[in-house]
Amino acid sequence: MRTVFLILAAAILLSGCVMATSFAGAQIRGRQGTRVANDFPGADLGAKINAADRDLGTSPGEILVKGGGTISTQVILSPGHTLRFSPGTYRLGTALLWEGAFLLKSGAGVIGSGWDTIIVEPAKTGWTVFQSFNDIRLQPAHSGTDSDIHISNLQVKGANPGVDGGVRQTVSLGNCHRCRVENLWLNGTGVIGVQAGGSPFGGNYAQDVTIRRNLFTRVATQAVAVVNGRDVKIDGNTFKDSGRCCLQGMTAIDLEPNDPSDIIRNIEITNNTIDSTNSNFIHGNGILVQNGVRTRGFGPVLVKDNTVIGGTLIPNSAGNVANGIYITAFTQDVKVINNTISRVAHSGIRLENTTRNYISGNKLISTGTGGILSFEITNTTDSQIFNNVVIVDPNSPLGNEVIQEAGTSARNSYKGNTGSKGSLAPNIIRP
């Protein structure tokens, strides 16, 4: 009996040791998957982050950054590594004109704690904050692909007093596949906000990109742009007070291929709010869909359930948006459904040099001033314009209730469109 008891006790003791060893091993493995960048050597936070990234090696893991500071060294984030920022202000001193302050390889991510994680763009040289690695490092530039990159939950604040039209981007995804940009606040930044698509060299393009629930305030030029992409979703974003300076053209959402080999396929623009009430000037368009390079790889495009507000519905005000939704330049197969456009200076909806569109269920309120009509269809063919409402709010009487077809337009169908006095037939103007 004593022998049996001793054997049992020994077994229990051994089992406890094994469990303790296993638990300790799990703790060690957990620690092995996380690095605190602040604890590593380096002249600035960027150098410390790179040291932590190297220490993680090829294993997946997280790099934590705490307390704010200066990032002067370009950060290169390896596959499977997530950079996680605590609250604080992180100032970029990278001074890179053609590369991002952060280059993200496939499978890398950057996550903040919320909009209290503030990354301040370089004060003098450079604007690009986040860029996919192969977009710039694989030659020719902007032709490479990366995948599974995610950026979320932080604020990027403008600091460079200069602006850079439509060349660079704050978030440059390039030809990224399965990439997400969510819950960012781009606050007064000086270049394009978020862009999907790079060079079509090698037949490459962005695919399965989601740009969702972001806030864009006073972004100097296009806030979201797609230049070469398939299956891109632009959903639930808010654009406020667009534009920085009256000399800069600005469109909140812009689909615009730059090369005849680019594609614009299966793009969805849904549930966004564009409110330019407090913009400093009439900045351009709310949503622009164009194909000036005449790529064959165009469409379909869905523009649905968006709200475009050019200004307050008050007397003697035309608003700060030119056209609410503008479909133009050899586009095709665009659906514009259930959008609300109010107090824009020019057309609420304008179709020009486009074909095979379906425009239905939209509401235009106090749009069209200065000889420009609320709803213009010019050089447009084989399109359906159904069940739209075009009215003028008495509190904001600048505007008109006119649907007009002009130019070489042909074979378009109109049904169920209404104004404040009932059924609204189009004016047909032939050359």
Language model feature labels by segment:
Residues M1-V4:
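Positively charged n-region of N-terminal signal peptides that target proteins for export
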Residues I7-G16:
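Bacterial N-terminal signal peptides
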Residues T70-R84, R91-I111, I119-S152, N160-C176, ...:
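Extracellular beta-strand-rich solenoid/capping regions of secreted or surface-exposed proteins
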Residues I76-H81, L104-A108, S147, C176-R180, ...:
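Short "repeat-start/strand-capping" segments in structured domains, especially the N-termini
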Residues G114, P122-T238, C245-C246:
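Right-handed parallel beta-helix
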Residues V36-R84:
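Acidic Gly/Asp/Thr-rich repetitive segments characteristic of extracellular carbohydrate-active
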Residues T73-V75, R91-W98, G114-W115, V120-T128, ...:
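Short glycine/acidic-rich loop motifs that flank beta-strands on beta-rich extracellular proteins
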